Amino acid sequence: MLNSKEFVRELQLRHESAWMNPNVGSAETALAALPLTRADVDAAEARLERFAPFIKKVFPETAADRGLIESPLTEIEHMRAWLNENKGAQLAGKLFLKRDSDLPVAGSVKARGGCYAVLKHTEDLALANRLVEMRDDYSVFATRAFRDFFSQYELHVGSTGNLGLSIGIMGAALGYRVTVHMSADARQWKKDLLRAKGVAVLEYGADYSYAVQKGRERAAEDPRSYFIDDENSVDLFLGYAVAARRLKAQLAEQNIAVDEEHPLLVYIPCGVGGAPGGICFGLKQEFGDAAHVYFAEPVEAPCMLLGLASGLQNAICVQDIGLTGRTAADGLAVSRPSGFVGETVKAIVSGGFTVSDEHLFTDLHALHETERLFVEPSACAGFAGAVELSKMTDYLESSGLGAHWENAAHIVWATGGALVPEGEREKYLAN
């Protein structure tokens, strides 16, 4: 295993590498030291339940889940066999895909945090203006009167693509004026889709951090504008954290035990950190020390792992060590991590891995061939973590995971893909 200094050197060399967090401690102790609590996740979960009648009405594809924005958990045994045979993996137990790539409304994990942040702001405005009480039927938010009210307000967000889609789609459905500030990495089809929904898209020839800053500045000019801050938002974070509770129920439905003798290993693609950080926080709340969460980042944009391993959090960016921040995994093309997320997860995330663009496409193609499932390149990052961890015999032994490896449940969190147009899918699969 590499120490943190050696790992940063591997990052500089653009090597696919692994970092195991030396600061991870007992979940109970680590969670007790954090300002966010189970009560915060309770409140977020309850708010999503209150808005479910509205979501069901406006987004009929959510009807099967009663207006909840949720995705399937699918065992991918053929992909597990492929990884073992073709990549030298030693994955025992079961391998699952958490298909946030197929989440309704926005087709990515950002439908969790992004939609929740919009709904939280919406409820705050509605309560302050006495439009509703919490016990009311929130399907009234779909009426013309409510849409007219929210049309007085504007939402701003900086995005590489998927967060902009979730906030743009949900914001427009509620009647807001929405402006998405897009970095140079954003895919054209995502901009086109937003504009088709009536969302204003401002394009910048610079990276994600610059787009976020521009969004922050624009929102500050108007008291009726609200900036959804991907770098610092507690609301986004809590929206993602709710996912862990839903996952717990899905695992129980499939008779998957999670405890010390049946460890849960979760591999999550990471950009600025909000989605993986929130999910990690939720998983540790639900499963404690039985959950082991690993972040996966591109070799050119490993911002969160760089911040965690160096201890500098958002005081360092990938360009500081000679990397470009450019990657085909557009959702992960972030150069500087969230300091808020880094501080929150520094004692609960188990580690992380970096992956080359080449291997993202290899795994994208293999998943489609073996399971007939399509995800976008960013969503494939977790496979590299599962493969690499399975080969780290010293770490597995020292961490105690090796003793229960045969009983492990592995979850690769697929973060996006459902909205990718057919022409783009064909290009990805041909790459």
Where are these regions (language model features)?
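PLP-dependent amino-acid enzyme catalytic core
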Residues: 1-431
